[in-house]
A protein has these predicted regions:
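Duplex nucleic acid-engaging cores and interfaces of nucleic-acid transaction enzymes
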Residues: 1-63, 67-68, 79-80, 84-85, ...
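Short loop/beta submotifs within extracellular cysteine-rich repeat domains
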Residues: 2-3, 55-59, 65-69, 103-107, ...
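Conserved, well-folded catalytic cores of nucleic-acid-processing
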Residues: 11, 26, 67, 115-121, ...
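Surface-exposed interaction/gating patches
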Residues: 44-56, 93-103, 128-163, 178
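Acidic/polar low-complexity surface segments
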Residues: 71, 121-123, 169-174
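A general structural motif
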Residues: 78-79, 87, 126-130
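Conserved small/polar residues in nucleotide/adenosyl-binding loops
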Residues: 175-182
């Protein structure tokens, strides 16, 4: 779905606001997973998506340029899967996926080919049976990332400390003896 900001009603600081379901034509089994600000639907930009089961998908942003009242299908999901995160990318970004086991994989977005809107996607990270993907990040290799555990422990780590691999691996350990939130 997409909604122009001026279509959202202005409200006072203390007002409750208006439910998004009243502004979007969501089905009963649908919910809002993420919100992306888009000013123009460029041919040179992509929407990068990641699911709970470690699947990733890259779709050209221009494929979402037409507005439909019933929304536009962005990804096909299995019954027990759900969208964890989305990002607008250039096609050459560094992608980071973090798992509930404290592992993080870093790979270049170019390892994921552009797909149509209804495609399922490809494996971004290999997860064990009880693991889930908990975060999708797009990062600059010269920057640092902040990792925070469910128990409130946090640390900053240089992105370069995580080796860049091909997509589909298990990733490197970013946290040990850690309980991360499950979604």
């Amino acid at each position: 779905f997409w909604l122009k900001v001026y279509e959202i009603p202005v409200a006072s600081r203390t007002s409750k606001g208006r439910p998004l379901v009243n502004m979007l034509n969501l089905d009963d089994d649908e919910s809002v997973s993420d919100i992306l600000p888009v000013s123009e639907f460029s041919e040179n930009e992509y929407i990068f998506m990641a699911t709970k089961k470690g699947t990733t998908k890259k779709t050209n942003l221009s494929l979402f340029s037409k507005k439909y009242k019933s929304g536009i299908k962005a990804i096909n999901l299995d019954e027990d899967d759900k969208l964890i995160g989305t990002a607008i990318t250039s096609g050459e970004e560094e992608i980071l996926l973090a798992s509930s086991a404290g592992k993080l994989i870093r790979f270049n977005e170019s390892h994921v080919r552009p797909m149509g809107r209804t495609a399922r996607g490809v494996r971004g990270i290999r997860l064990k049976k009880d693991e889930k993907l908990i975060s999708l990040m797009v990062g600059d290799p010269s920057k640092t990332i902040l990792c925070v555990s469910e128990n409130g422990f946090g640390k900053k780590t240089k992105l370069d400390d995580f080796p860049s691999h091909n997509r589909g691996g298990q990733g490197a350990v970013s946290y040990t003896h850690l309980t991360l939130p499950t979604t």
